[in-house]
Each structure stands twice: as structure tokens, then as C-alpha cells.
Amino acid sequence: MCVQGLGFVGAAMAVAVAQARTPEGIAAYQVVGVDLPTPDGHARVDALNEGVFPFPTSDKKMVTALTEAHEVENLRATTDSSVFQSADVAIVDIPLDIDFLDDDPQLEMSSLEKAIRTIGRQIPKGSLIIVETTV
């Protein structure tokens, strides 16, 4: 399972999915967080791979969940979008920007469209793509 976009919401989603357990208590998913190969993206990826949440948070449960995921090694992060080739589920957490021009809201969707194209070119046919946007 991949989570595209490691902003606060995407990073939290990756941690939450990594917490899922089978009835036997085994990690239910191998989760890969994916971000852009930018300085910010690399910093987020590095933090998650070190078991550190990439944003300030007072949510102790999230910090504990990330520590557990790091210990059982079912959460990793990368800037390499080829990981979608082996994903059966992708969760897309890309913010949608709204600009107000002449008091009319204009929704900027180019980041979301680019992410969907990147995933669509690589993810296996029949896989599930879930779009969870923040506005």
C-alpha cells in the first residue's frame, strides 16, 4: 500500500495505515509513503525512515504509532514513484489550493492531476486508488 503526499495529512495517514493489525496482531500492511524529490520531500522521507514524524505534533499516540511501525518495519518512505508498480492500493493525499481572484474561488488541481497521472502510469490494473484531499 502506498500513500502519495507526505504533508501532515499524508504522513499521518501512512502512520495510521501502518497501525492496522490482523486478528493475530501482525501488521496488516506494508506501507510506503511517497513524496516528491524536492528538498522538503527528501526531509520528510528521511524523517519517517528514521521513525520521526516530519512535522511538529503534540499527538503522543501518533508518535507512539510511528515508533511501533518503525520497530516492526512495516512503514518506509521514498521519493521513487516506481514503488506504485507493486501497490494494490494507493491513497493520494495532495492539497488542493484555492485562489480567490476577483472574489471568485479558483481551484488549482494541477498537483493532484500530476499525482494521479504518475500513479496511473505505474500502478497495476485493478488496483484501488483513494483520493483524500485537503483544502
Show where each model-derived region lies.
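Structural/interface elements that position substrates and couple domains in central-metabolism enzymes
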Residues: 1-135
